[in-house]
Amino acid sequence: MSSDETTSKDEIPVIDLSNSNKEELLQQILKACTTWGFFQLINHDIPLSLIQSYRESKARFFSMPYETKLKLKRNAQNARGYFDDELTKRRRDWKEALDVGVPGSRKWEAADFDESNACLDGFNQFPTQEECPDFRGITVQYFEECSKLSNRLARLMASALGITEGCDNAQILDRMALDHTSYLRLNYYPPCDTNDTTTVNPNEPPPLGISPHRDAGFLTILLQDDDCHSLQVARFEDSDLGHDDSWVTVNPIPGAVTINTGDMAMIWSNGIFRAPLHRVLTDPTKKRYSSPFFYNPGYNELIRPLDCCSLEKDLEVKYRPCLWGYFRALRFAGDLTDLGVEIQTSHFKMETKSDHIEKQDEFQKVVNFEENFNVEKYRAILESKA
């Protein structure tokens, strides 16, 4: 399928990264990021042979004995590792997952728990070579390919907005390329038979693979199974989600990856880019896999609305600056335990009364981003209700 074939209002756009017409490519990216906030990307330069090896390696990981995976369990002191109990919007997801992030040392060859690898998100926890042969090497290789593609896409997004080289917002992209705090999530969705009362509560709504949410970071690169039709994107805003036609299913193109913009891109673009609400459905008979790569800023980065966008020079500033490390810590804490109110970009809107601005200043003063974060230690800051 070529990028100009997707004209249906019920399909997210398809963009060909190999398009030699730079202006056309930028216009396609701009339209996708400002309308859907989602697009499928073809000819993205991640080798298809690597994608296939990564799919096979991922399946081997989740087929390991449960007790082996539990040895890698994440906790309140370490955001990275295996888990099967995540909360999304305060509701438990129907999935198993493993989070792997860029090491604090930026050196994958260092041992996982080497002190140099400490960072806010914690330490990686890989299975041993004996437990899951070649898993580490293949995963790291795929991670680095996603990093390169993310940097390329972020710069294209900036160009689409008319951001010029040398301005503050372009420099943020330079820093992000060097200091990004991205992580790769490996998801496994077991079959979910809603008629099986031993696993599903018949008195509650059918569980979702992942409940409706927006991604917190800058952008996401998602790899799905080619025959998977479970990812759905909200066509409308929250107030309209009660309608049956509120959700549009993403039908994966073989060999493509799916891109979506996140909360930080929305703040950075002053609301020009859309951070879309999306969810994942369960399947009663089929097991499925997916892998989102979350491209995130440095922990110390204050994400603020762009100041040199030729597209909207007179646009009123809509957001206050947002400290990524603070936003990320609160989102992780909310994944792990119910803190009552999940932090959103709406808390940083100029017209919103919120204590998060003061809280993030306090957070930056007391938290060392070169140490793994402890949810319980900083609960007093995290439990802000504003």
Can you annotate each of these PLM segments?
Residues 1-386:
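Peripheral, non-catalytic segments flanking oxidoreductase cores
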